[in-house]
Amino acid sequence: GIYYLSANDQLKFNSELSWDNGDNFGIDSKDPQDYGEYNGGSENLTVKNAGYHLVVVTCELSADKKTIVKKVAISQPRVYVLGDCGMGWSAYDEAWKFRETGGVFTSPAVKAGNLRLCVRLTDTWGADNSWQSEFNIFNGKIEFRGKGGDQTAVPVTVGQVVSLDFRTNSGSIQ
């Protein structure tokens, strides 16, 4: 997810909503961390710099199929307008990237069509299953697509601008 984190905030993860159950984990270092990918471990992940962070946790079965390999990646959020209203379907285009000012992410003025938004997870178009990081705004709330099918169409007109506030999981189209 995309979160605003203050310097020295600490994160830990769990498979349950409880510290008493599940599999609690952090990373393998006590040092404050900047953007990067870190191996799972027992230490809290301490954030080095304040700002918005895209936090992605991956858990994969080890090659010997005996353990779960955990990793935590932290990066700068990169949010885009895609499809007919923005950059199309073939490559990430910086002209269609949202800009963050004062905690709000703002899009460039969109083209007419059905709005589709995504979070860029890797540097290669298509390598990140960008469709799984798609989201849209419904009734003023940000809703992610996840592994489901296409979301309900959100029609927009030429020149409208999308604003997103991930602190409140809200957005608007004006």
Give the residues covered by each predicted segment.
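Insoluble glucan recognition modules
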Residues: G1-Q174
